[in-house]
Amino acid sequence: MNDIMNQSYRLASGYSMPVLGLGTWQLVGSVCERIVKAAINLGYRHFDTAELYGNEREVGRAIRGVERRELFITSKVSSEHLRANDVISACMGSLRRLQTDYLDLYLIHWPNDEIPLEETMDGMQYLIDEGRVRSIGVSNFDVGRMRDAISAAESPICNNQVE
């Protein structure tokens, strides 16, 4: 397992993402914290959470004590927060809960056809420009929506996470 723990992909943003990560969906409370700590002890450095999961505080407590540069943290903005200002506010909330200054990867959790992707991407770009997010991506986008996201974004879309 150590070999795969040391492998990473180079994202279009130029940053590297570990190939193996721990998803924290459905992990809550002290169970979440214990599992993330155990994963750290096993060598995991990539952790995936989301504002919708309700466990960012627990993930933040679990990663405390690990040098930030050793970690790769992914979080996701929920589909009701895709207006530019809402994207920024949601990210700042995630950062506070995770007790970190930046996210390595920030994803749009689910598409929302009520909000133009251009507006969402304006918020994402602001977060990149301010150093709060290193790479951006999407989750649960079909091919057409992925093309739209690529067209709407100033920075590269580095990931499409499909659940």
Predicted regions and their residues:
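N-terminal binding-site loop/beta-alpha segment at the start of enzyme catalytic domains
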Residues: 1-71, 101
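Active-site mouth loops of central-metabolism enzymes
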Residues: 18-30, 75-85, 114
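Conserved, mostly hydrophobic/aromatic
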Residues: 22, 39, 47, 59, ...
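Active-site beta-loop-alpha junctions enriched in small/polar residues
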Residues: 25-27, 50-52, 76-80, 108-111, ...
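Short, acidic/polar
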Residues: 27-40, 83-99, 119, 144-147
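Short, well-ordered amphipathic alpha-helices
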Residues: 59-64, 91-95, 124-125, 146, ...
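CE4/NodB-like, metal-dependent polysaccharide N-deacetylase domain
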Residues: 87-108, 126-130, 152
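Beta/alpha (TIM)-barrel catalytic core signal, keyed to glycine-rich beta->alpha loops juxtaposed to Asp/Glu
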Residues: 111-163
